[in-house]
Amino acid sequence: MNPPGDAYTDCARFLGTRLEKKGFEVGYHRAEGTPGDNDRYPRTNLVARLEGQASGPCVHFNGHLDVVMAGKGWTEDPFGAVVKEGRIYGRGTCDMKGGIAAAIIAMESLLEEGISFPGALEFSGTVDEETGGYGGVAYLAHQGFFSKPRVDHVIIPEPLNVDRICLGHRGAWWSQVETHGRIAHGSMPFLGDCAIRHMGAFTQLLEERLYPELDKKQTKMPVVPEGAKRSTLNLQAVHGGEEESYDGLPSPCVPDSCRMVLDRRFLIEES
């Protein structure tokens, strides 16, 4: 689950061991120095390659190992992989363990049928897609893993129904907004200045001014689903008052700081 990005190494080695048995040359690449990487949560990427019978293009399959937090409202254990009526229920079964499984089974089926092919097959299991990909795809790209002549074609089996092939996606930009106030005892808020109220005023401005403008922007590209044809802004997280790691009862204080994380998605027509 990401954050914090636990079990990356275990996931990478699980897949790597399976591919190694099929003859793939397997390597594990830790993205040291990237956001989130540390000895407790190492950002370990898997890259596996199998050479064909002659020279030719390389087809590379990529899938991300991480999932976002489970959230609430599940009717099944989100990490139990419960099977019911031909469906697997769990966090990440669609985004994107299903795609990873499909890619690996497709490559294995090719080998099991004894089909010879020129060029090479590659697979990468990468980290941190859900938080920007800095330690995953971006790191491997900077190391030259996806560049020619090593790789010619890349297939990313992200979930988008079985009858659609996408050639790109919207741009992303994450940002933070901070408001500040003055701390005081909660019984006498008039002596302080509430940073959360300031953030509320900022949010109201977004609702009144920015969101109507975003709704006017619509791409001419054949984007799916329909709602994704517009520019979007998601208020991703708000933290104020107590420390973010604090899980006890709140203390009676007027919050002197508040932080909001924004997730902005751009259309191809925007710059």
Q: What does each of the following model-derived ranges do?
A:
Residues 1-89, 112-117:
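Acidic/His- and Gly-rich active-site-bordering loop/insert found
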Residues 39-44, 53-56, 170-173, 226-231, ...:
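A short, glycine/Asx- and small/polar-enriched loop/turn
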Residues 31-37, 162, 219-224:
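Short, solvent-exposed loop/turn elements at beta->coil junctions and helix N-caps
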Residues 105-112, 201-207, 264:
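Short glycine/serine- and small hydrophobic-enriched flexible loop segments
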